[in-house]
Amino acid sequence: MDVQAQRPPLLEVKRNVELKAALVKSSSRVPLSASRLKRGPDQMEDALEPAKKRTRVMGAVTKVDTSRPRGPLLSTVSQTQGHTAAQKGPKKTGPRGCSAIGTVLRSQKPVPAAPAQKPGTSTAPVVVGKRAGKRPAWDLKGQLCDLNEELKRYREKTQTLELENRGLREQLREVQEQATTLGTERNTLEGELASVRSRAEQDQQRLETLSARVLELEECLGTRERLLQELQGERLQLQEERSTLSTQLEEQERRFQATEAALSSSQEEVVCLRQKTEAQVTLLAEQGDRLYGLEMERRRLHNQLQELKGNIRVFCRVRPVLEGESTPSPGFLVFPPGPAGPSDPPTGLSLSRSDDRRSTLTGAPAPTVRHDFSFDRVFPPGSKQEEVFEEIAMLVQSALDGYPVCIFAYGQTGSGKTFTMEGGPRGDPQLEGLIPRAMRHLFSVAQEMSGQGWTYSFVASYVEIYNETVRDLLATGPRKGQGGECEIRRASPGSEELTVTNARYVPVSCEKEVEALLHLAHQNRAVAHTAQNKRSSRSHSVFQLQISGEHAARGLQCGAPLNLVDLAGSERLDPGLHLGPGERDRLRETQAINSSLSTLGLVIMALSNKESHVPYRNSKLTYLLQNSLGGSAKMLMFVNISPLEENVSESLNSLRFASKVNQCVIGTAQANKK
């Protein structure tokens, strides 16, 4: 196709406009009319102004972007408008965008190409309407009107072309966006393709590696099979040889070979057993270290728990009503539920008392006064011995861990102190007291700790302090009942450990030995008949158990005393009664008991107040127990009271003393380790 035929109609329009402008600007040879001759230069310029405007419009029309590829344009206004409406429809984009470009290109209707022109010739402008004919050269006004009409038509056509141009630009922008999207997709797909190719190469390499490994294993398997066949053949050959050997020499050689094989196998077994033994020893050492660490952590947490509970704790126990005793009135003793509700063990009790003095003065019934007390734990009359021991089992464990421990039983005579510490009649395991139960617990735990490398030894002693005199309750033979020679001394100069001279220190290792010692001490203890109790303990009994532990593998040692003290019962004597020889003895005993108990209270208060001087020496009891009462010890006091209303005064005194002790704090306990 000729180049001239491919020119767009817009260039042809531009060329026709330029020709028209030249025609307007050219001077005509027709004489001007009078009206035209009368016009001045300004009026001529106004007359020619439409031509100038038409020239500027044509110049603006010619400023079309020719940098992009030219496609076929629509030839008519209706085609352009239809094409513009088509562009406003929904755009459909295919998977790769190629179909969208094809749709845009197909939507453009081709314009019939102009006939080919020869060089140097111009194409006549497209005339939409018909003119009457060519005006004469002198009819400039008519020519001007024609040109204005033609300019109007060209303006309309220019607007149409501008609309078409905007539509084409919009199409171009959409195509460019689609091309950008397709380029991005292409880059993404190329990256995915590269990744897939990389993985394929890696899989191929792995496949090659695995194939090589398979070949290697197949080769190894073939070698093993050949070796197995060779060995089987050799075995058959040896069997044939053995069956064919008949001489004594060959028989001896066979036996020699068998002996060598057995020896080699035995040596291999020995080596294997040695390795296993070494591994077991290593594992045992590791487990021992771990077990030791866990044991130390248990001791630390156990001691921390005991410190949180308090290094001085007070438990209250109310004995049950015995046969022949009057039942107390309802509401005399009330046990409120624990802090967590009815299921929680009680920690307080309320005691009601009527004021007889006020009743005597006024003559009216005395009102009831209620006294409330709170302790770490309260045991009602129905509490069992096992339940009581469960509360102090952790404290007994602290003694095994190296902390000095002292447990008191305090209260008036007949309140159940001895029953709490030693228990009831022999032979009934349900009535065993704290001492036999504590010993059973210590022996059991020591046996378990032996598997961790700990070795424990226990040495027991049992003394009583009667009228400030120390007596050995384990004395036998001629020394039985003669405790005046016992004195409290230092074990060695400069040592903090105390010992009782002339007292028996018996090593114990089982429950039967402890039971025999308790039976002997029970027979030797000083008792007397009082108004409150037919067999009242008139002395303080102190059961001391010195615990020594050693871990030879780690070079550790620990030791601490466990003191279980049954304090003497207090009982007031009527000062108006005539004192016979027996009553004078009871008075001296009561004075000594009250003095030692008062000193015990002063010592505890001094320790709580961090006083520089603690009056340990004011009493034999506190002097003997001073290493178990200080800041490095743990102490527990049982206050035993009677449930009878006739003993309400003594019960109140005991509860008030116990409340003072419960408010004391003696500091942080420390283990005795070396």
Swiss-Prot record:
Observed phenotype of the null mutant: Centrosome amplification as well as multipolar spindles. Cells overexpressing Kifc1 show a single microtubule aster and growth arrest in prometaphase.
Q: Which InterPro entries match?
A: Kinesin-like_fam (IPR027640), Kinesin_motor_CS (IPR019821), Kinesin_motor_dom (IPR001752), Kinesin_motor_dom_sf (IPR036961), P-loop_NTPase (IPR027417)
Q: Where in the cell is it found?
A: Nucleus; Cytoplasm, Cytoskeleton, Microtubule organizing center, Centrosome; Cytoplasm, Cytoskeleton, Spindle; Early endosome
GO process terms (BP): cell division; minus-end-directed vesicle transport along microtubule; mitotic metaphase chromosome alignment; mitotic spindle assembly; negative regulation of centrosome duplication; vesicle transport along microtubule
How is this protein organized at the quaternary level?
Binds NUBP1 and NUBP2. Interacts with PPP1R42.
Indicate the segments forming the Kinesin motor domain, all copies. 311-664
Phosphoserine PTM positions read 28, 33, 35
Q: Where is the composition biased (Polar residues)?
A: 75-84
Sequence ranges of Pro residues compositional bias: 336-345
The annotated region (Disordered) lies at 66-96, 327-366
Please describe what this protein does. Minus end-directed microtubule-dependent motor required for bipolar spindle formation. May contribute to movement of early endocytic vesicles. Regulates cilium formation and structure.
Q: Which residues form the signal peptide?
A: none
Expression sites (tissue/organ): Highly expressed in 14 dpc embryos, spleen and NIH3T3 cells. Also expressed in testis, brain, lung, kidney and cultured astrocytes. Very low levels in skeletal muscle and heart.
- Extract the Gene3D superfamilies matched here: 1.10.287.1490, Kinesin motor domain (3.40.850.10)
**What is the name listed in the Swiss-Prot or TrEMBL entry for this protein?**
Kinesin-like protein KIFC1
Ranges in a coiled coil? 146-315
Organism lineage string: Eukaryota, Metazoa, Chordata, Craniata, Vertebrata
Q: What else is known?
A: Purified early endocytic vesicles bind minus end-directed Kifc1 as well as plus end-directed Kif5b. Addition of anti-Kifc1 antibodies leads to a decrease in minus end-directed vesicle motility in vitro.
Supply the source organism for this entry: Mus musculus (Mouse)
Q: What are the GO cellular component annotations?
A: early endosome; endocytic vesicle; kinesin complex; microtubule; mitotic spindle; nucleus; spindle pole centrosome
